[in-house]
């Protein structure tokens, strides 16, 4: 008998980190919750990272996911912004890992391909497919929608990921 698996998807960002929680049983997906954790742009970097940490820790504690999926970052022309995003991503990976969850990573193109069928697409296409895949899904803004898409990507890929990890562990 299959067990329902609760997945949290995290879309890291220093200003806004999106999160989305879904339940998956076999091929079925069920929306649980979504939102964003924000940091105060007037605060120093360390304080902002603490805000992200504390907010994500509360979400993980309250929703009790079984697995986490985090979007990989891309390198842009602004090296300072890329480094800050990398630090926010570190928090996004640390929080579920410290809670004992396995953490999986997905490239943005893989997330889009899992949700809309192609690796390059518009935000509106993601929003539309989220509503088709999970009609009861509620999300405010692109960050929460992206986080739900990341969770769905993991739900579609989790069997293969688990097998690869077992084989690598030897």
UniProtKB/Swiss-Prot annotation:
It catalyses: Endonucleolytic cleavage at a junction such as a reciprocal single-stranded crossover between two homologous DNA duplexes (Holliday junction). Mg(2+) 2 binds at residue 71. Pfam families: RuvC. CDD domains: RuvC. Its EC number is 3.1.21.10. Its cofactor is Mg(2+). It is found in: Cytoplasm. Binds 2 Mg(2+) ion per subunit. InterPro entries: RNaseH-like_sf, RNaseH_sf, X-over_junc_endoDNase_Mg_BS, X-over_junc_endoDNase_RuvC. GO terms for cellular component: cytoplasm; Holliday junction resolvase complex. Its main location: cytoplasm. GO terms for molecular function: crossover junction DNA endonuclease activity; DNA binding; magnesium ion binding. Mg(2+) 1 binds at residues 11, 143. The active site is at residues 11, 71, 143. It comes from the Bacteria. One of its GO terms (biological process) is DNA recombination. Keywords: Cytoplasm, DNA damage, DNA recombination, DNA repair, DNA-binding, Endonuclease, Hydrolase, Magnesium, Metal-binding, Nuclease. Gene3D superfamilies: Ribonuclease H-like superfamily/Ribonuclease H (3.30.420.10). The RuvA-RuvB-RuvC complex processes Holliday junction (HJ) DNA during genetic recombination and DNA repair. Endonuclease that resolves HJ intermediates. Cleaves cruciform DNA by making single-stranded nicks across the HJ at symmetrical positions within the homologous arms, yielding a 5'-phosphate and a 3'-hydroxyl group; requires a central core of homology in the junction. The consensus cleavage sequence is 5'-(A/T)TT(C/G)-3'. Cleavage occurs on the 3'-side of the TT dinucleotide at the point of strand exchange. Homodimer which binds Holliday junction (HJ) DNA. The HJ becomes 2-fold symmetrical on binding to RuvC with unstacked arms; it has a different conformation from HJ DNA in complex with RuvA. In the full resolvosome a probable DNA-RuvA(4)-RuvB(12)-RuvC(2) complex forms which resolves the HJ. NCBIfam families: ruvC. Belongs to the RuvC family. This is Crossover junction endodeoxyribonuclease RuvC. It comes from Agrobacterium fabrum (strain C58 / ATCC 33970) (Agrobacterium tumefaciens (strain C58)).
């Amino acid at each position: 008998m299959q067990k329902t698996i609760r997945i949290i998807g995290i879309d890291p960002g220093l200003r806004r980190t999106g999160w989305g929680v879904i339940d998956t049983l076999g091929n079925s997906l069920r929306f649980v919750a979504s939102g964003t954790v924000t940091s105060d742009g007037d605060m120093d970097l360390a304080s902002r990272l603490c805000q992200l940490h504390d907010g994500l820790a509360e979400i993980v504690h309250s929703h009790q996911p079984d697995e986490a999926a985090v979007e990989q970052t891309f390198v842009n022309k602004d090296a300072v912004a890329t480094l800050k995003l990398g630090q926010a991503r570190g928090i996004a990976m640390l929080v579920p890992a410290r809670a004992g969850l396995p953490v999986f990573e997905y490239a943005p193109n893989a997330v889009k391909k899992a949700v809309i069928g192609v690796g390059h697409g518009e935000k509106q296409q993601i929003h539309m497919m989220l509503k088709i895949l999970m009609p009861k899904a509620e999300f405010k803004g692109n960050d929460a929608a992206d986080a739900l898409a990341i969770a769905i990507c993991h739900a579609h890929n989790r069997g293969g990921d688990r097998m690869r990890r077992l084989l690598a562990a030897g």
